[in-house]
Swiss-Prot record:
Residues reported in the UniProt entry to bind Mg(2+) 2: D238, E239
GO biological process: L-tryptophan biosynthetic process
Record note on quaternary structure: Homodimer.
Organism name: Desulfotalea psychrophila (strain LSv54 / DSM 12343)
Protein name, per record: Anthranilate phosphoribosyltransferase
Function statement: Catalyzes the transfer of the phosphoribosyl group of 5-phosphorylribose-1-pyrophosphate (PRPP) to anthranilate to yield N-(5'-phosphoribosyl)-anthranilate (PRA).
Binding site for Mg(2+) 1: S105, E239
Keywords: Amino-acid biosynthesis, Aromatic amino acid biosynthesis, Glycosyltransferase, Magnesium, Metal-binding, Transferase, Tryptophan biosynthesis
Amino acid sequence: MAVTLGKNNMNIRQAIARVVTGADLSESEMMASMEEVMSGQASPAQIASFITALRMKGEAVEEIVGAVRVMRDKATFIDCGLGPDDILMDIVGTGGDGADTFNVSTTTSFVVAAAGVAVAKHGNRAVSSRCGSADVLEALGVDLSLDPATVARSVQEIGIGFLFAPLLHAAMKHAIVPRREMGIRTIFNILGPLTNPAGANVQLIGVFERSLTTVLAEVLLRLGERRSLVVWGEGNMDEMTVTGTSYIADAHDGRVTSYAVEPEDVGLARAAVADISGGRTPEESAQQVRAVLAGEKGARLDMVLLNAGAALLAAGRVETIVEGVVMARDVVESGAALKKLGQLVAFR
């Protein structure tokens, strides 16, 4: 249970003192502390102490919600003209899982976009693998430097756009040095997927710890998203996996439902971890993405079909993940997913 001081003007020194005792901050207290971090008022030592204390205690739902609100407020908004009934999706992982899989969420984004769901793919360079979404997209020929208006137009005109995090979260610069020097997973790994600058209202989010599935699902309910699936794959993967059990927390209709999925449950073969490994370079990773989108059979394609099936469920295009896998397979076999990649590469 969150501990509330009754005032919203807590400073970061007071917040650190609270958190090291094991007490949770309220949403407003967290917002006040994060405002100091994101505005450059907190020192590197204070930032490091604060996020380490949160990590050791375990970030509470109200703390994450408060941090998300501040980070969203500081971000550069990508206005895709989202109406009240429109769906805008993001497929993203926290990173930090150390699994070194290929670029599953990036590849999945093209399949989902080709199925007719608008995708605002939020991403960065490598965190837990040799090659992050930005690295592989750059190797594929996607221009990472497009201005916000052009990115918004990309989503509107071709149904997919890439939101390069460093260009849209300028206030994060104040936390870069402490994060880099600490070298551990912190609340900032969690915040990235929750702070899509285009305001995506449906998400498939992979997390680096199973316990975070229900926590982030509760956060997404508090933030008012339409529907989101938060997933963790057995073997410590921040995505659904065909190498073991996938655990899902489904935030929908005001509640969180948790369940598990085996690859065989959705008509996919179980695979070895080695079969879904990532490339050693961005160029090698780009070849893997192209091969999957072109329909090359194997565990990598099955990984994408599984995650795309879940994403299509979240977006309301299908009633079950099984149906989503079938739809995703049809999209890939039609050539539409590979064509969608070509459209994004060519977009200016």
